[in-house]
A protein has these predicted regions:
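Cleavable N-terminal signal peptides
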Residues: 11, 22-25
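Short, low-complexity N-terminal intrinsically disordered segments enriched in polar/charged residues
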Residues: 24-59, 63, 67, 71-75
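A solvent-exposed, acidic/Ser-Thr-rich amphipathic alpha-helical stretch
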Residues: 66-140
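A beta-strand edge to alpha-helix "cap/lid" segment located at domain peripheries
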Residues: 25-38, 109-195
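Bacterial N-terminal signal peptides
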Residues: 8-17
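A structural signal for alpha-helical segments
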Residues: 45, 84-87, 152
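Bacterial N-terminal signal peptides that target proteins for export
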Residues: 1-9
Length: 195
């Protein structure tokens, strides 16, 4: 089945559900899959691509790669972080280049001989996907090994509030807010951040 055919089948299934014929969503198309199965496959593929995007973002952070970091955003993407709100992929890349220079000044003398000192992790990913738009929330934390004993410590944690958009078949962040629990002004409020 072509992409158009799959999309058409999903639209038909949704229309039939809205119209009240729920059993129609479970009928098989000529390719052998029920329309509900096609919708589930589309969701699974979108979710996998979004989780891959999140992983690429984390690797870019840890290896301080400003261009790879910025490439996870749409051209008009917005980064809302502790340093302020930055709009546009080019401005995000410039901002991250500045962060990289600031962090480089803090590195110890043996830093060039060592791998990246931070490792960022993401978990508890909650996503709502609606066509070519999605919203997401997830926990993040970072482990730092830059202590005198090089023993790892959790040095930061929080959650992301994300808006995503599919551009030319690929998911990208259109807006990412980084909530940081070690900073009172960026900490989560009393309400559950999940939907």
């Amino acid at each position: 089945m072509t992409n158009f055919g799959a999309a058409f089948a999903a639209v038909v299934a949704f229309s039939l559900l809205v119209a009240g014929d729920a059993s129609a969503a479970h009928r098989r198309d000529d390719g052998g899959l029920a329309l509900a199965d096609l919708m589930a496959l589309r969701y699974a593929a979108d979710r996998a691509e979004i989780e891959n995007l999140q992983a690429r973002y984390m690797f870019a952070v840890d290896w301080q790669d400003p261009d790879a970091y910025a490439s996870t955003f749409t051209e008009d993407g917005v980064l809302d972080w502790a340093g302020g709100v930055v709009s546009g992929r080019a401005a995000i890349a410039e901002e991250v280049h500045g962060m990289r220079a600031t962090f480089a000044k803090r590195e110890s003398a043996d830093a060039p001989k060592r791998p990246a000192r931070l490792r960022h992790f993401i978990s508890n990913v909650a996503l709502k996907i609606d066509g070519d738009h999605a919203t997401g929330r997830a926990y993040w934390f970072e482990i730092d090994n830059n202590t005198s004993t090089r023993a790892p410590i959790v040095s930061g944690y929080g959650h992301y509030d994300d808006e995503l958009r599919k551009v030319d078949g690929h998911w990208l962040f259109s807006r990412r807010r980084i909530n940081n629990e070690v900073m009172e002004s960026r900490a989560a409020g009393p309400a559950n951040p999940a939907w």
